[in-house]
């Protein structure tokens, strides 16, 4: 006979249907099932939530595709392991190439959570560093600083922004020592952390060409293309909605023109999503100044950003 | 309040352990809160000696239902209360007496809901059959506790000379258990039990 509820088992002991030893075994099976189901469900749900968060990002179709590939690869490696088949080593060090504001840090943050959920990383935190955090000022200082950052990143992701700046100073610079130490740490602690080198497209390519040993150690290269004007507009609308603001169709046209002008005129330093955020924040401040002049305001006025608020934004 | 439940076979020394541990923790008197299987709660006030005289005995199933004591343990600068619950002994077979069966059912119910399990094992009761078949209820309690990761085995009656040679066999019989050899009668090994309580509060 099978018992569905613990209370039924208790009643069965009272009635003398089963001995306590049998009841304990039933309890053990019951608790095991409950725990396994809840663990699997929770973990799956969290993984799906993270992937949903990634899917929610505008554009970045290549990035999304690669993350799905990594997910599938890891899942299949797990299944192969269960069947005692050969598995490929999981080397997940990555290179992110793209202009500022194209979502490199955002994706790295999502990846750190994602890798924790699927069991690749134990802690899933992101340590964001730059040249100054790794390169020291005197002999021995660089090793100390770099090792410290690698130690901090244990169980998570070490994200080096503008990584090419490590090779900036030439042969005698301590940056080269930092690179060598990182390469060694990647080998020695390959299962403990993931290293992501990020930076502008051109500079990163130059950096990898001058350090051929590095290129082969990073199996995953992800390009973060610039957003199209339409994508930037969608990002702007998302940001406004998140802040409980809205824009009319006319204002949308003004914003679109403004974004296109930014893209065309200041292309080299254009910060993509970051520039959009700055534009939105400036417009919000302009709206506040405009409304302050009025004695009373309606809910609609508080909600809508007008075209005039964007006009003076540079 | 965290609840530590004391379980084991009948006559393994659960009640004596509970009362002597209360004395070791500094209690001179105890309020024993009993809960019958139909949820009737009664509270009796005893000195430790009186409680031992009334509640402990050599007859099987002297404790027909659960009885709890609230004790204090100093942690840092404060005293933290915890509940220790003595239970009706459980055996491998279906007991003919309905009252005892209900007591056993109540024990298992508390075992599931408790925060921590102290499994009292009568070391003198370990026989060759134990070693060969591992059919005793003690193995079922052990297997249940280990899975739940909130379990300590208290190897009782180490004051008896016959138990000396059996203590080393415990590591083979219960390999994954955190085992503390104790004598409920002589309050031996209670320092380690106190540490275990402090660690799991």
PLM regions: where:
Chain B
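Canonical P-loop GTPase G-domain recognition
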Residues: 152, 157-201
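Generic enzyme active-site microenvironment
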Residues: 84, 120, 154
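Conserved Switch II/interswitch segment of TRAFAC-class P-loop GTPases
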Residues: 89-97, 111-135, 158-163
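Amphipathic coiled-coil/heptad-repeat helices and related helical stalk/stem segments
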Residues: 100-104, 137-138, 166
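Conserved G1/Walker A P-loop phosphate-binding module
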Residues: 1-92
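Short, conserved loop/helix-junction motifs that constitute active-site signature segments
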Residues: 142-148, 174
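Conserved alpha-helical scaffold flanking the Walker A/P-loop in AAA+ ATPase domains
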Residues: 68-72, 105-110
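Loop/turn-to-beta-strand initiation segments
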Residues: 79-83, 115-116, 150-151
């Amino acid at each position: 006979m099978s018992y569905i509820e613990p209370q039924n088992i208790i009643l069965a002991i009272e009635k003398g249907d089963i001995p306590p030893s049998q009841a304990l075994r039933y309890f053990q099976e019951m608790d095991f099932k409950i725990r396994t189901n809840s663990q699997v469900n929770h973990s799956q749900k969290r993984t799906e939530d993270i992937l949903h968060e990634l899917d929610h990002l505008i554009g970045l179709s290549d990035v999304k595709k690669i993350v799905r590939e990594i997910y599938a690869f890891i899942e299949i490696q797990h299944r192969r392991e269960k069947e005692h088949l050969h598995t490929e080593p999981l080397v997940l060090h990555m290179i992110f190439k793209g202009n500022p504001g194209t979502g490199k840090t955002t994706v790295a943050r999502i990846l750190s959570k994602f890798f924790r959920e699927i069991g690749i990383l134990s802690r899933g935190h992101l340590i964001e560093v730059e040249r100054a955090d790794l390169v020291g000022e005197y002999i021995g200082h660089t090793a100390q600083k770099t090792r410290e950052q690698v130690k901090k990143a244990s169980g998570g992701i070490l994200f080096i922004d503008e990584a090419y700046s490590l090779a900036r100073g030439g042969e005698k610079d301590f940056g080269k020592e930092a690179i060598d130490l990182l390469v060694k740490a990647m080998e020695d602690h390959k299962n403990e952390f993931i290293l992501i080198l990020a930076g502008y497209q051109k500079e990163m390519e130059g950096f990898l060409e001058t350090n051929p040993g590095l290129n082969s150690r990073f199996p995953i290269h992800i390009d973060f293309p610039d957003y199209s004007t339409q994508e930037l507009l969608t990002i702007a609308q998302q940001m406004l909605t998140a802040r409980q603001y809205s824009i009319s169709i006319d204002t949308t046209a003004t914003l679109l023109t403004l974004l296109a002008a930014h893209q065309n005129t200041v292309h080299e330093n254009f910060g993509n999503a970051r520039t959009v955020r700055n534009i939105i924040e400036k417009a919000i401040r302009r709206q506040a100044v405009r409304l302050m002049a009025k004695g009373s305001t309606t809910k609609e006025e508080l909600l809508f950003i007008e075209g005039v608020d964007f006009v003076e934004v540079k | 309040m965290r609840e530590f439940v004391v379980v084991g076979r009948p006559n393994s020394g659960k009640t004596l352990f509970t009362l002597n541990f209360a004395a070791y923790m500094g209690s001179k008197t105890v309020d024993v809160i009993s809960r019958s299987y139909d949820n009737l709660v009664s509270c009796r006030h005893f000195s430790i000696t009186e409680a031992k005289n009334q509640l402990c005995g050599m007859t099987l199933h002297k404790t027909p239902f659960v009885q709890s004591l609230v004790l204090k343990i100093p942690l840092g600068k404060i005293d933290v209360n915890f509940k220790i619950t003595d239970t009706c002994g459980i055996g491998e077979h279906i007991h003919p007496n309905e009252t005892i069966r209900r007591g056993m059912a109540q024990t298992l119910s508390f075992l599931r809901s408790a925060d921590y399990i102290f499994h009292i094992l009568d070391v003198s009761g370990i026989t060759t059959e134990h070693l060969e078949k591992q059919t005793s209820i003690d193995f079922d309690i052990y297997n249940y506790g280990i899975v739940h990761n909130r379990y300590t085995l208290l190897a009782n009656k180490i004051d008896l000379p016959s138990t000396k040679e059996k203590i080393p066999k415990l590591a083979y019989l219960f390999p994954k258990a955190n085992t503390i050899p104790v004598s409920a009668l002589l309050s031996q090994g209670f320092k380690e039990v106190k540490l275990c309580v402090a660690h799991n509060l």
